[in-house]
């Protein structure tokens, strides 16, 4: 296990190196997707490994937290399928680094990827870094449960530069993918639950869009 963790550390692209990769893809109009997974995704997969029925809906959280996480009425089997699809199709995968020292948060027990990224990039990039990325993209589409977040981007950057799609539950994912792929925005910032992470690569593939899973760090990106 220690060797596997060392291998993960050696293969993880740093926050600042990944910023250069993102800027390059924006400059040449190439597609890129990155998804982040945190401790909650590790817990869901561990629940399944411990014997949770794939036909049961997600348990072990309050109804309020499940609703906030966009996982209302999803089964363990469906969320596991969607998480696997997300990792298999994304260009870059940013698992929580907690798994390096805590076995119960070790996402790479369940998923692996050739291109790993430091999970903290979305929070670590400074305001100047974020502005540089937004300026390089010129146009940005925000996908988030809170319409106020979308309104803020559109007021700050104007409606010509910023778009918004609402995503508040996993069963909205397919509709969001279809709409996002048809829109012209070059950069897509999204916050999606374990049941909707796969929208990142699905939106990016073949569109020339750079799609970044910023998750709970979305407020840091407010211009």
Where in this protein do the model-derived segments appear?
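Glycine-rich anion-binding loop/nest that anchors nucleotide
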Residues: 187-195, 213
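Glycine-rich phosphate-binding loop signature in dinucleotide/nucleotide-binding domains
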Residues: 181-184
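Short, solvent-exposed amphipathic alpha-helical segments in soluble enzyme
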Residues: 51-52, 154-160, 204-206
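Short glycine-rich, flexible loops that bind phosphorylated cofactors or substrates
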Residues: 102, 196-198
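Electropositive, gly/pro-rich neighborhoods at or near active sites that engage anionic ligands
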Residues: 1-145, 149-153
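Short, flexible loop segments at boundaries between secondary-structure elements
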Residues: 208-223
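Short Gly/Thr/Asp-enriched flexible loops that form oxyanion-binding sites at enzyme active sites
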Residues: 198-208
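Redox- and metal-dependent alpha/beta enzyme cores, enriched for Fe-S-associated oxidoreductases
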Residues: 133-179
């Amino acid at each position: 296990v220690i060797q596997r963790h060392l291998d993960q550390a050696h293969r993880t692209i740093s926050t600042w190196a990944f910023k250069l990769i993102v800027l390059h893809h924006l400059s040449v109009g190439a597609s890129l997707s990155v998804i982040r997974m945190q401790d909650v995704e590790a817990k869901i997969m561990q629940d399944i490994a411990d014997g949770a029925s794939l036909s049961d809906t997600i348990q072990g959280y309050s109804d309020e937290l499940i609703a906030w996480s966009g996982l209302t009425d999803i089964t363990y089997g469906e969320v596991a399928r969607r998480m696997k699809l997300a990792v298999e199709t994304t260009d870059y995968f940013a698992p929580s680094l907690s798994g390096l020292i805590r076995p119960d948060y070790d996402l790479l027990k369940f998923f692996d990827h050739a291109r790993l990224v430091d999970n903290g990039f979305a929070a670590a990039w400074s305001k100047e870094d974020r502005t540089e990325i937004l300026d390089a993209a010129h146009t940005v589409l925000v996908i988030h449960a809170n319409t106020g977040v979308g309104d803020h981007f559109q007021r700050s950057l104007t409606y010509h530069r910023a778009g918004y799609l609402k995503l508040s539950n996993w069963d909205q994912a397919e509709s969001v993918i279809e709409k996002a792929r048809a829109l012209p925005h070059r950069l897509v910032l999204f916050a999606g639950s374990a049941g909707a992470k796969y929208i990142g690569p699905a939106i990016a593939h073949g569109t020339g869009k750079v799609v970044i899973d910023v998750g709970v760090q979305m407020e840091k990106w407010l211009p």
